[in-house]
Structure formats: C-alpha cells, structure tokens
C-alpha cells in the first residue's frame, strides 16, 4: 500500500471517529490546513515531472477530494445528531394536563363555569349581559315588579332588610335579579335581549338552599314577543346546556307577580340512578319559572304595554350546576374546601364554547 493510500485510510478513520464538530474540525485542519498532511503533499506537485503528475499528482488530488467529501458528510451527520439530542433534552409534551404546572393548579369554581356556559349559549342567540346592584331599594326589588303591599316576600322572615335611613326608607339585599330588568327598560329602548346572572339573598338555609345563592334571569322585550318564543328559547337552552340532542318539556300554569301568564317549566329526565339524566326517561323535574312580562312591570319600566310585550325567565345557577355535575349539597359550594374544588372544579384554560364543548 502506498503512502497516499495509507494516509487516506488513516484520515478517513479519524473523520469517522470524530464525535463532535470540534473534533472533526481538528482532523480537517490536520489534513487540509496550511501545514496539514494533504496540503504538504500538494506542495510537491510543482517539483514533479509530467509523468509523476499524471500518476502521483492525480492520487494526491483524489486524496484531497476524498477527505473534503468525508469531512462534509460527517459534519452533516453530526449536525443532525446535535439537533436530535437538543430536541430530546428540551422537548415539552404539550399533551400533558395543565394541572401538572404549578401555575395552573387552581380550579374554576362550578358557579363561574356555569355562568360562562350560560353566557356562551345566550350570546350565540344574540343576548347581552346586564348587571345591577346587590343592595336594592324596596321600589326596584318589589314595587316595580308588581309585588303588592303585604306580599309575603316583603316580610322580615323572608328578606334581608337594612335599617331605615333618615327618610324612613329601608333598602334590601335583592331577593332576585329581576330589578335589573326594570333598570334596563328604563335605560334603553326595545328591542331588549338580556341575561342577568348574579347573587341573590333570602333567609333560607338547608342542603338545597343558601342565604346567598346565584340566579340567572332572561328578558326579551319587543313588539311581537310571545309564549312560543319562550318555549323555543328555553328548549334550545336546555338542549345545549345539558348537552343532549333533544328534550321534552312541559309548561305548568303558575303565578309570579311580575309575569302574566306565568309557568313552571319541567324537563323530562331519568332519576333512577345516582345521576339525573336529561333527554331520556319518564320522570319530570322542575328547572325554572317563566312567563310574559306583566303590563304593570312594563309601565314601571317606562314602556307602553299596548305597544310592547315581552317574556322573562329565571333559574337558580347553583341548582342547575348540581343537576348537571352531580353535587349533592349546595352548602359545599361556599365552604372553600380545596378537596371539593379539586374534584368539582374546572381547569383554568378550559373555557366553555359552543364549538369546543361546554364542559369539555
């Protein structure tokens, strides 16, 4: 084997053994640098005879090309290996649950989740959100909603009253979110399409009642609103909220001072197991009350009942949360028990949408 062949074998072996780009560069310099072994051989070409250049000169040039190609190929392999090693070391599994991150271990309270779900549903129908004060006057909480003097709801045992002010007027913790309906009618002209989620207060406390609880009410005012519209809106809401393909509902005549006619709405369900299933079964469960807005309430809101009419409905957010997600005791909602929140709460980034799923 000639000295050129030996050098070729030696250099190719060193190139193949280089484990990183620094080692490879050292081999390249030792072969092709100014004082490299291949460069030294190239310097001898000038002193060769024409015959030697055809044989030995060609072999030296072939050696140079072989070393150059081998270095380039090895460099490419090392770059790919380096990238793969970095990816392996720095990979973040985006499929891991959010709760694995310390910053994301909190939970969204079921009531906040329910409000977001209901907002998503009614926003898709063209409704906006209205809000009002928790501390109300007797006028907005009772009088403007057609509660007559002497109505049981005005009694101390049912409502939280503040001490009378210097004018003898007593304010109350609102017993429903309905005062916002009157305030909205006073503030804007029809058509009106709003939902009103918020806190309400009544003197009641047991497994299914709390002195402070949450309601959502809806109000539609225009010139042609009717009972058929109520049925459609509530049926679409129930199907979407309980995430079922269809629901069977029944409207039972009832009485509320602020609506006429008034209805209690039941939804068909299956109560044979530990969890209530909607969209199937032969049982019935009351979920909300509704009706056509009473003409007197329209008048208190500054609207002419001969020109405008509307419908309204209301339901307890805490109760429908219990029905949908299976919480057994309403009082647990307000105990700030981290274990309960971990079990029933929702991940912070799982915002409910109609497209992505309400409770996904």
Swiss-Prot record:
Keywords in alphabetical order: Aminoacyl-tRNA synthetase, ATP-binding, Cytoplasm, Ligase, Magnesium, Metal-binding, Nucleotide-binding, Protein biosynthesis
Any one GO molecular-function label of the UniProt entry: phenylalanine-tRNA ligase activity
Enzyme class: ligase
Reaction(s) catalysed (UniProt annotation): tRNA(Phe) + L-phenylalanine + ATP = L-phenylalanyl-tRNA(Phe) + AMP + diphosphate + H(+)
PANTHER family the UniProt entry points to: PHENYLALANINE--TRNA LIGASE, MITOCHONDRIAL (PTHR11538:SF41), PHENYLALANYL-TRNA SYNTHETASE (PTHR11538)
Binding of Mg(2+), residues: 260
Needed cofactors: Mg(2+)
Matches recorded under InterPro entries: aa-tRNA-synth_II, aa-tRNA-synth_II/BPL/LPL, Phe-tRNA-synth_IIc_asu, Phe-tRNA_ligase_II_N, Phe_tRNA_ligase_alpha1_bac, Phenylalanyl-tRNA_Synthase, tRNA-bd_arm
Cofactor annotation comment: Binds 2 magnesium ions per tetramer.
Name the record gives this protein: Phenylalanine--tRNA ligase alpha subunit
Subunit structure: Tetramer of two alpha and two beta subunits.
GO CC entries: cytoplasm
GO annotation terms (biological process): phenylalanyl-tRNA aminoacylation
């Amino acid at each position: 084997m000639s000295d050129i062949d030996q050098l070729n074998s030696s250099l190719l072996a060193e190139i193949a053994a280089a484990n990183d780009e620094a080692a490879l560069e050292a081999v390249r310099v030792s072969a092709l640098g100014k004082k490299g072994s291949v460069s030294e051989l190239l310097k001898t070409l000038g002193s060769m005879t024409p015959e030697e250049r055809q044989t030995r000169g060609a072999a030296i040039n072939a050696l140079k090309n072989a070393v150059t190609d081998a270095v380039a190929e090895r460099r490419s392999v090392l770059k790919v290996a380096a990238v793969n090693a970095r990816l392996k070391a720095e990979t973040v599994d985006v499929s891991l649950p959010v709760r694995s991150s310390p910053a994301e271990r909190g939970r969204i309270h079921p009531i906040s989740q329910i409000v977001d779900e209901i907002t998503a549903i009614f926003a898709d129908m063209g409704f906006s959100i209205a809000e009002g004060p928790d501390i109300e006057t007797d006028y907005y909480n009772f009088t403007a909603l057609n509660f007559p003097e002497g109505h049981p709801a005005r009694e101390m045992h049912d409502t939280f009253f503040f001490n009378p002010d210097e004018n003898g007027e007593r304010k109350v913790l609102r017993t429903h979110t309905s005062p916002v309906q009157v305030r909205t009618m006073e503030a804007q002209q029809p058509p009106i399409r709003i939902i009103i989620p918020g806190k309400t207060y009544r003197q009641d406390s047991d497994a299914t009642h709390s002195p402070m609880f949450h309601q959502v009410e809806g109000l539609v005012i225009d010139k042609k609103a009717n009972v058929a519209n109520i049925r459609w809106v509530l049926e679409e809401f129930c199907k979407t909220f309980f995430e079922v393909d269809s629901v069977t509902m029944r409207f039972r005549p009832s009485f509320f001072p602020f609506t006429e006619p008034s209805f209690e709405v039941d939804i068909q369900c299956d109560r044979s197991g530990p969890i209530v299933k909607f969209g199937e079964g032969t049982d019935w469960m009351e979920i909300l009350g509704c009706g056509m807005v009473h003409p007197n309430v329209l008048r208190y809101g500054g609207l002419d009942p001969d020109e405008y009419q509307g419908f309204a409905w209301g339901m307890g957010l805490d109760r429908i949360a219990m029905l949908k997600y299976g919480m057994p005791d309403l009082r647990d909602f307000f105990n700030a028990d981290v274990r309960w929140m971990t079990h029933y709460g929702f991940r912070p980034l799982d915002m409910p949408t109609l497209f992505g799923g309400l409770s996904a």
